[in-house]
């Protein structure tokens, strides 16, 4: 993952010895293992339904003991977030290593959409109208009472097939609504949440929290599949509002939280006598590192120092004699992934030209312009001139290996996230 590689490079640039560990699906080596910043790399067992996270946690514990690790920075994906909470408890119980990871209970609460919203409301913080539903009947009962309000159905679990479905409910006609809901598997074992649709711009944040203090923070515009990163100015009103929400959330949650905390926000605008009012609604929480960490490329040493405060005692708000301040990217580059842009902006529009799709020529020209602009003035989220091999391996070995595995196993996928190396099944 790009976020893990970015963090590894940050610690390396700050003068630390860095050990890497990751899953290697289908036996294809991940690109991060070839980075010059790693002193050693460990391939981890992936949690599964048969053995749970037992082997995964044991692999991590063995690596921590063997390498005498001082601090473990979790960089989990959506599918192993809770397992990392379990690993944190085991590692800190059996070693002196400090984990940058929430405990199992906190991770599970924040990871699930419905429990996160309930927790947020319990903290007396704003949250969108959200309902837990375990049957189609429950969905229709709520929709039938809705007046001038639309909702979006979201699966509570990890469901790649429905993740990109942002269908507004109710549909224009009753029959369309019933037909859409009928195609969804909504049961007690497969619960969903019905969340009020908030028209407005979407934003995401990334924060490092150590012992209840926000050490690192950034906010940026977001989308359903975010592949272009541009940090908001830290002094902008929206960025400050999202930072304040994060700090309030951490303070009210108590227990000296330590881990990564990322929120997805929607901003609702409404007119009033005082002018245009903006209301910030958190719609989802990711209790793990966010890819937006790449935006701290120019602040590697400062960011690494934020993590190391987990090892240092704090006296009167100061660590190692230095007063704490929140690290934010001052003038970061804009980030993209060349493989994604090449396909989405150039190759896909080119294919549409050959099949004579309407507007394809204009789409191709505009796409080429954007691609060249990104190539010249933006920064690739994986490439570094002094550490080029991970970038080369990602596109020439890792992804071809993944595509070949899908063909051999006849596994269908609908899209990929190049930055997280996630393939969305369908």
What does each model-identified segment do?
Residues 207, 216-218, 275-288:
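A short beta-strand motif that forms the metal-chelation/ATP-contact edge
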Residues 305-426:
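Peripheral (often C-terminal) accessory segments that flank ATP-dependent C-N-forming ligase machineries
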Residues 239, 291, 297-309:
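Gly/Ser/Thr-rich active-site loops/lids in small-molecule metabolic enzymes
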Residues 106-192, 199, 211-213, 235-244:
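Active-site nucleotide/adenylate-binding loops and adjacent lid/helix of ATP-dependent enzymes
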Residues 197-223:
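Membrane-embedded hairpin module used as a gating/binding unit in multi-pass transport
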Residues 161, 223-234, 286-300:
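Glycine-rich phosphate/pyrophosphate-binding beta-alpha loops
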Residues 1-101:
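ATP-binding N-terminal substructure of ATP-dependent carboxylate-amine bond-forming enzymes
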Residues 183-189, 227-279:
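A long amphipathic alpha-helix within ATP-dependent nucleotide-binding catalytic cores
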């Amino acid at each position: 993952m790009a976020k893990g590689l970015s963090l590894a490079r940050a610690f390396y640039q700050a003068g630390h010895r860095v050990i890497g560990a990751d899953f290697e699906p289908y036996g294809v080596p991940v690109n991060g293992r070839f980075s010059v910043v790693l002193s050693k790399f460990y391939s981890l067992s992936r949690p599964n339904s048969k053995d749970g996270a037992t082997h995964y946690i044991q692999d991590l514990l063995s690596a921590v003991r063997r390498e005498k690790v001082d601090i473990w920075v979790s960089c989990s994906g959506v599918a192993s977030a809770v397992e990392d909470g379990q690993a944190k408890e085991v590692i800190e119980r059996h070693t002196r290593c400090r984990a940058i990871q929430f405990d199992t209970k906190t991770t599970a609460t924040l990871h699930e959409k419905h429990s996160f919203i309930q927790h947020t409301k319990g903290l007396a913080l704003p949250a969108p109208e959200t309902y837990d539903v375990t049957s189609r009947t429950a969905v229709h009962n709520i929709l039938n009472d809705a007046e001038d309000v639309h909702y979006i159905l979201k699966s509570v679990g990890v469901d790649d097939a429905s993740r990109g479905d942002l269908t507004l409910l109710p549909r224009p006609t009753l029959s369309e609504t019933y037909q859409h809901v009928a195609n969804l598997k909504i049961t007690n074992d497969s619960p969903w949440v019905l969340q009020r649709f908030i028209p407005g711009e979407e934003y995401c944040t990334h924060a490092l929290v150590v012992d209840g203090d926000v050490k690192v923070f950034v906010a940026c515009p977001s989308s359903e599949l975010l592949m272009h990163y541009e940090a908001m100015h830290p002094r902008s009103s929206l960025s400050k509002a999202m930072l304040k929400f994060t700090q309030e959330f951490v303070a009210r949650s108590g227990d000296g939280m330590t881990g990564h905390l990322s929120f997805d926000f929607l901003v609702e605008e409404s007119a009033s006598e005082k002018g245009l009012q903006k209301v910030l609604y958190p719609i989802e929480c990711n209790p793990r590192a966010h890819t937006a960490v790449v935006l701290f490329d120019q602040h590697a040493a400062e960011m690494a120092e934020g993590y190391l405060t987990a090892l240092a005692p704090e006296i009167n708000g100061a660590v190692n004699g230095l007063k704490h301040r929140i690290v934010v990217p001052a003038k970061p580059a804009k980030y993209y992934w060349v493989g994604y842009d090449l396909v989405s902006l150039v190759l896909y529009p080119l294919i549409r030209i050959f099949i004579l799709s309407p507007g394809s020529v204009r789409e191709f020209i505009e796409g080429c312009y954007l691609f060249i602009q990104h190539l010249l003035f933006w920064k690739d989220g994986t490439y570094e001139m002094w550490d080029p091999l991970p970038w080369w391996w990602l596109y020439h070995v890792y992804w071809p290996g993944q595509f070949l595995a899908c063909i051999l196993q006849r596994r269908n996928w609908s899209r990929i996230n190049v930055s997280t190396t996630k393939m969305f099944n369908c």
